[in-house]
Amino acid sequence: MNIQALINDKVSQALEAAGAPAGSPAAVRQSAKIQFGDYQANGVMGVAKKLGTNPREFAQKVIDVLDLDGIAEKVEIAGPGFINIFLDKSWLAARAEEALTDDRIGVAAEKQQNIVVDYSAPNVAKEMHVGHLRSTIIGDAVVRTLEFLGHNVVRANHIGDWGTQFGMLIANLERVQNETGEVSMELADLEGFYRESKKLYDEDEEFAVRARAFVVKLQSGDEYCAEMWKKLVDVTMVQNQINYDRLNVSLTRDNVMGESMYNYMLPGIVADLKEKGLAVESDGAQVVFLDEYKNKDGDPMGVIIQKRDGGFLYTTTDIACAKYRFEQLNADRVLYFIDSRQHQHLMQAWSIVRKAGYVPEEVTLEHHAFGMMLGKDGRPFKTRAGGTVRLADLLDESEVRAAKLIEAKNPDLDTAEKDKIAKTVAMAAVKYADLSKHRTTDYIFDWDNMLAFEGNTAPYMQYAYTRVASIFKRADVNLADLTHPIVINDEKEQALLSTLLQFEEAVLNVSREGQPHLMCTYLFELAGKFSSFYEACPILNAEEAVKQSRLKLALLTAKTIKQGLDLLGIETLERM
């Protein structure tokens, strides 16, 4: 249940009834401190200013017509005109009882939309590196959240599977085949193979001529080139899938929608943009001039969509991509989880898309940009030698470090269980360290912090779940055995319950903002509220009615943490 939305509607109605213009914002927010109630309506002062009336007097008028019977225990004016709302304990308890017996723990499904989410997007013939981590796991957390809310989500892995580099790769494949009769198709070999191909292309003119010829052949549908290209894609995606599976990322080969997928659309798009008068010839190239973007001379910036040699650009592909997602996938909303450095490029492509009428304004095109992963020196995360860190190497190191941690914490566990726990904690630590940071900011990657059992970390959250779940196990009862209702007698109980019932608000915030850190913040706060409750309120030793009430709170906490972590793509453990 979205309590914030419920109260916001009630306050909005009261504002209008008190004389505010229709549509005046109630601005209901969760209260920062318990002494200010559960929710606070902050819109009164702005409305009072427009009406030219005293904010506190107007706030009283709003309260006089505010219908929160049975929902709020008390409503009071604070400061210059804030309205503090204290929810009724019995009403909260009833909502918790409903959530306990609901598979969705009280979260309502939204009206279904078709939502395309573009994320991960590694390049073919190269191994995934740490630069791919943020797009992959942030995008996947949002995908899981949107699906949980009932939307039809299309995962779009826009891999880099096209371009002139394939000419040099195929030329080198042919050379090796001619010399040895076979070609290794392991991605680790391909990484070196790529560098070798580039060196040959730069230093051997005869090789470069052959490479350029292969580009033309590939674009013309040559059978041999198409076969070699497909092998390169297949080998790359097999290795990428290993990384996805290790990270518990929901992408599969079926979700690949690479650059090449839109090739057939590109000539038609250029022709259509010319016909619409949007594209004009400039120095032999086809260019769209955008008035909203100026060059250094103050003139409209030209965006090239076809080079003078007839070749197309990334912008042309992105125009086609947006058009396809609306026309063929019936998208209501398209989310791109792409590096912040691509922002202007995307905005220009989408400007052309809108001007051409390919995607109507009611369909949102959203760039959810993200910052960089930095080392402790504040520079882009690199190996000691200054090279790019392979994602697989990062995950391997995380497993080694987690294994040492689990061995120190629980040396008596059998080897198989320690290994399972270490792998689960390792992947969770890498993901949560990233997901818990604001998406748009850079963050420092720190092994010690991310594997700590204190603070807003994966090990802390996984342990919090294990601890809560173990209480219910020790009680040795099922939910059906708990016949006594939830009754709130302690402020720690109320603080926990109020936070538990804000889960839907956290889910909706992630879905709307594309910000998984909001879920991490919520779960960390929830774990803290449970810890305070557990210290202040005995559970198993309490008298039966109180014991059952508190066991229900513990169970709802465990279910909520588990569901929240699952939306982040993080697995829980029954013991650590």
UniProtKB/Swiss-Prot annotation:
InterPro entries named in the record: aa-tRNA-synth_I_CS, Arg-tRNA-ligase, Arg-tRNA-synth_N, Arg-tRNA-synth_N_sf, ArgRS_core, DALR_anticod-bd, Rossmann-like_a/b/a_fold, tRNAsynth_Ia_anticodon-bd
Predominant cellular place of this UniProt entry's protein: cytoplasm
Catalytic activity: tRNA(Arg) + L-arginine + ATP = L-arginyl-tRNA(Arg) + AMP + diphosphate
GO molecular function, one term: arginine-tRNA ligase activity
Localization terms from the record: Cytoplasm
Transferase listed as a keyword: no
Gene Ontology cellular component annotations, sorted alphabetically: cytoplasm
Pfam family, one: Arg_tRNA_synt_N
Keyword vocabulary terms for this entry: Aminoacyl-tRNA synthetase, ATP-binding, Cytoplasm, Ligase, Nucleotide-binding, Protein biosynthesis
Keyword Transmembrane: no
Gene3D superfamilies: Arginyl tRNA synthetase N-terminal domain, HUPs, Isoleucyl-tRNA Synthetase, Domain 1
One Gene Ontology biological process: arginyl-tRNA aminoacylation
Annotated signal sequence range: none
EC number(s) per entry: 6.1.1.19
SMART domains reported in the protein's UniProt record: Arg_tRNA_synt_N (SM01016), DALR_1 (SM00836)
Coiled-coil ranges from the UniProt annotation: none
Motif ('HIGH' region): 122-132
NCBIfam families reported in the protein's UniProt record: argS
Family named by the database record: Belongs to the class-I aminoacyl-tRNA synthetase family.
Oligomer status and interactors: Monomer.
Protein name: Arginine--tRNA ligase
Organism whose genome encodes this protein: Photobacterium profundum (strain SS9)
High-level lineage: Bacteria, Pseudomonadati, Pseudomonadota, Gammaproteobacteria, Vibrionales
